[in-house]
C-alpha cells in the first residue's frame, strides 16, 4: 500500500489546516520544495499536493512553487494535485507541467459535466476527491453537506472513467483520531476503481489496520499532520506497509 505524504500549500508555504479552516493553519515549512525532496528521500512513491489558496479562489494560486516542486521530484515519482481545478485549460496546463494526476473535488459534485469532460479529455489522469460526513458528501471546503450519498456519487463518477477516489472522512481529517476504516472499506467494496484513504492517520496501528483491508481495493493512504508532528515516522511506516503486503 502506498503511503502518500501531503503538502498543503498556502501563500507559498507548507501548512496543515485543522478541519479545513483557513484561519487555523500550522506552518510546517516555508520551503515546500525542500519538504517534497525530504519525502522523496524518505521513500515516498507518490506525492499529494493541495493548492489551498486555489481551492478557495477557484483557480491556481501557488503555481510557482508547484512548478518548482515538480522540477525537483516530478521525475522521481508521480505527483497529484487538487485545489482550484475548475476547467480543462487548467488541467492541461498542470499535466504539461509534469503533474501525473489532477484531483477534482467540489467542482465534480457541482458540475459533474466538467468531470465527465475531464475524464474524456485526459483518460487515466483524473482522480475525484470526495469528502463525506456520516456518508453524505460535503463541498466548498466542507462548509456545506449535500444530500448526495458518497457511495452513489462515487459509482456514478466511476462510470465517467475517473482513475480513483480519494475519500476523506471529515470528522477525522487533521484531528489525529484514526482512520474511518469501516466507511473506507464500504466505499472500496462498492467500486472497482481504487480508493485512497485520507484523513485521520495517526500511528502505525492505523497503517496495520489499513493494510489488513488493502485487498478490498484500498490503494493507498494520504498522510499529513501525523508525519509533520512526528506521530508517524514516514520511512518506517512505508517499510511496514510494504512488509505487510508481503
Swiss-Prot record:
The lineage's top-level taxon is Bacteria
What's the Enzyme Commission number for this chain?
A: 5.3.1.16
**Pfam families in the record, alphabetically?**
His_biosynth (PF00977)
Is RNA-binding one of the keywords UniProt gives this record? no
Please state which protein family the record places this protein in: Belongs to the HisA/HisF family.
HAMAP family linked = HisA
This chain belongs to the protein called: 1-(5-phosphoribosyl)-5-[(5-phosphoribosylamino)methylideneamino] imidazole-4-carboxamide isomerase
Upper classification of the organism: Bacteria, Pseudomonadati, Pseudomonadota, Betaproteobacteria, Neisseriales
